């Protein structure tokens, strides 16, 4: 499904300003850019675009309230300065599985003063010498890199609470999405059943008309037979009458 169509479906008759979370994972980005997302989503706090074929985020709309952004498993190699401009309050950023090769690419993230957690799993930049040390030095506001702090201690539950809450809400969204999709499917099935019933009724009417016509034909044949029989009887009586007259 194309991204703009997926966004329309995810709205579920809501206005963009009513949406706080938007999951667009595994849909298609035709030109490698974010499509169908506008600055009307002013209340959006969580956006997930995992594996959608993004090569650029240059046309990301202004999302002042966005706190968590999932961009993993795409082909992004730059344009990260857009994030500081469009998402100034971003706290969690996942860029895992993208084409980020050097530290200069993530340097623009310095302007994200509230950035607390950054994930770069499976990016070439992680192969650089002293990768973790240099990233923490470059981005002093970041507390957790790939899930661990400067001392290689895993982020405690309190610091990943946002992730857990979001996952729960995502599950609820998926359930609502499934219910909505099922409702659409049920409506389509009902329409098909109604069409089938109309065809059956039409067929019965045709059969009734045929039966009625057959009945008319049978009645006509019976009348013809009766007329012939009556004529035959008259012919029999006529010779008898002639004989009586001769006598």
Swiss-Prot record:
Gene Ontology biological process terms, A to Z: negative regulation of plasma membrane bounded cell projection assembly; nucleocytoplasmic transport; regulation of apoptotic process
Positions of region (Interaction with E4F1): 165-247
Modification Phosphoserine occurs at: 17, 158, 202
Localisation: Nucleus; Cytoplasm; Endoplasmic reticulum
Stretches for region Necessary for tumor-suppressive function: 150-172
Residue segments, region Disordered: 150-247
InterPro entries with a match to the protein in the record: AN32, Leu-rich_rpt, LRR_dom_sf
Modification type Phosphothreonine: residues: 15
Main location: nucleus
One CC-aspect GO term: perinuclear region of cytoplasm
Record PTM text: Phosphorylated on serine residues, at least in part by casein kinase 2/CK2.
Keyword set, alphabetical order: Cytoplasm, Endoplasmic reticulum, Leucine-rich repeat, Nucleus, Phosphoprotein, Repeat, Repressor, Transcription, Transcription regulation
Pfam families, per the entry: LRR_9 (PF14580)
Assembly behavior: Component of the SET complex, composed of at least ANP32A, APEX1, HMGB2, NME1, SET and TREX1. Directly interacts with SET. Interacts with ATXN1/SCA1. Interacts with MAP1B. Interacts with ELAVL1. Part of the INHAT (inhibitor of histone acetyltransferases) complex. Interacts with E4F1.
Similarity comment: family membership: Belongs to the ANP32 family.
Job of this protein: Multifunctional protein that is involved in the regulation of many processes including tumor suppression, apoptosis, cell cycle progression or transcription. Promotes apoptosis by favouring the activation of caspase-9/CASP9 and allowing apoptosome formation. In addition, plays a role in the modulation of histone acetylation and transcription as part of the INHAT (inhibitor of histone acetyltransferases) complex. Inhibits the histone-acetyltranferase activity of EP300/CREBBP (CREB-binding protein) and EP300/CREBBP-associated factor by histone masking.
Protein name: Acidic leucine-rich nuclear phosphoprotein 32 family member A
Gene from which the chain derives: Anp32a
């Amino acid at each position: 499904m194309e991204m703009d169509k997926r966004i329309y479906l995810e709205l579920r008759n809501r206005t963009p300003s009513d949406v706080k979370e938007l999951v667009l994972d595994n849909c298609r980005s035709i030109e490698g850019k974010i499509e169908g997302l506008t600055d009307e989503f002013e209340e959006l706090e969580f956006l997930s675009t995992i594996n959608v074929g993004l090569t650029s985020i240059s046309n990301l709309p202004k999302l002042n309230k966005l706190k968590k952004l999932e961009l993993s498993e795409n082909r992004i190699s730059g344009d990260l300065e857009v994030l500081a401009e469009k998402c100034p309050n971003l706290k969690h950023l996942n860029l895992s599985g993208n084409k980020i090769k050097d530290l200069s690419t993530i340097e623009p993230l310095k302007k994200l003063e509230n950035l607390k957690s950054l994930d770069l799993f499976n990016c070439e930049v992680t192969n650089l010498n002293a990768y973790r040390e240099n990233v923490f030095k470059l981005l002093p506001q970041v507390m957790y890199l790939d899930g661990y702090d400067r001392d290689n201690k895993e982020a405690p539950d309190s610091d990943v609470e946002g992730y857990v809450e979001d996952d729960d809400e995502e599950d609820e969204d998926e359930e609502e999405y499934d219910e909505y999709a099922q409702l659409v499917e049920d409506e389509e099935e009902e329409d098909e059943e109604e069409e089938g019933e109309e065809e059956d009724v039409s067929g019965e009417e045709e059969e009734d008309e045929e039966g009625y016509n057959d009945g008319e034909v049978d009645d006509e044949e019976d009348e013809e037979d009766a007329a012939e029989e009556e004529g035959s009887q008259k012919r029999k009586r006529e010779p008898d009458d002639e004989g009586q007259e001769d006598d």
